[in-house]
Every structure is written in structure tokens, then in C-alpha cells.
Amino acid sequence: MISRVAEALALSDLLIPAFMPLSHQPRPWQGAAPRQRRGRGTEFWQFRPYTAGDDAARIAWRASARYRQPLTKEHEDAVPSSLTLWVDRRPTMGFTTTARTKQHQADVMALAWGWAMARQGDWLISLQGGPHQRYHDILAMEQDLDKQVLFSQGPLPPADKVLLCSDFLYPQETLAALFSLIRADDVQVCMLYDPAEVSFPYQGPIRFRDLAGGGDCLVEDAQALRTSYQARYAEHTRALEALALPRGWLVTRYSTEGPLTEMLG
């Protein structure tokens, strides 16, 4: 199997020219310029009227003569944009009936996005709730990704953009509590699923094992549960969207059966 780093490197090469936004809103994503704010930087930003107490050395004499009023120069501080990546690492992410687990696909997705941003040079990246920092090595990024803890233990650090990767198989009240801990406006919720979790292709007697340690469940006729199961799963997906969409977040769904290049479409 190709390593997740190799897959992420290949995918990140596609993300940059694709200019893919993290939100459905028309905000810059790949290659976005740093924000500007008034500061003590060396780059000229704008003129403004001179006021008492301003440094006389900053008076723009030529501009003041042209506009016939005293003007002073303002400079800018470049403020790097920040991206927080969170990948769920619960046991349910390891379930698979395909060549790739939800965990593997989520890791590749996060690494690709993070590395694409890190290569732009003006993005600070936070992995798994850690501090925002500059990354110069995707292997270091991968190591920090593996340190994941549930962000229910505390809010994620404030960020301009947030990418959440999970199967989101939580009770609705748990999802609501988790989402309340996110301090960002531009958020993408990436819901990964195994095709069997949607189609429920089982029939006859089946013993289901709870990957989270809740014990086994023996079902005598799995096929008889298919319709009710599919309805419950669809209801859960709608509940997730009902929590995310009113916040202005984007919800996308990816099957482990398909390539992650689907995110480019």
C-alpha cells in the first residue's frame, strides 16, 4: 500500500493549482495573501490625516502638499492566515470493507491540505489542537497528526479556517457540544464513510462487533434491518447537516471506495 505521506504529497500538488476553497463562500484559499493590519511594519499601507500625538517623522510631506492637509503614513503588519486540522482517531475510523480505511483517507486528506498550505509560506498550521506553527517537513506534520486527542477536552485554537475529518458517528448531542468548541467561521466538515455503512449489504445471521468496545450484537436476519438502518443513517446525516449548515459551514461526504481527488471537483 502506498504510504499516506506519498499520497498526500501527490494530492497536495493538485490542490494548489486547483485553487480549492475550504468554504462554499468565495474566499481565497490556495495562495491567499496575508491579511493586513495597522502596525510597525516596513511596508507602506495607506495615508491618513495627521492627528495630535502622531510621530512627526511619519508625516508624508509631498502627499500633504498635494492634498493640502497634513497626512501621515501608516504601515502594515502581515498577519499569517491560520488553518486548524482535526482528524478523528476513534476505533470506528478503522472500519473498512474496501482497500482504504476511513482513518487512512482522513489522514491523507488532512496532510494534503496542510502541506499544500504550508508550502504557500503564509499559513500557520495547527494539528490536533496543538499550537499554530510553520511546517517545513511533511514528516513532522505526520507525526503531529498522530498525536490526536479528542477536542472535546477543550476548544480548538482559534483559526481562520478549520478542516474536520471524521465519520461523525456520534450522538447528535455530542456533535452539538463538539461543534460549539470550534472558534472559526470558515469550517469544512468532511464526513468519511465506508460504502457498507450506507448500503448495509448484510443478510442472514450476522454478529456485529462494536469497535468502540461496547460488545457484540448477534442479528438473526440482517437483511430485515436494512431499510430501518438506512433510514436511521440518512437521518443521522441530516442531523449533522442541520448542526453545521446554519453556522455557514460546508459539509462534504467522501466514500473510502472513491479517490480523494473527488475533492477537486
Language-model-detected regions and their locations in the chain:
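Short, surface-exposed charged micro-motifs
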Residues: A60
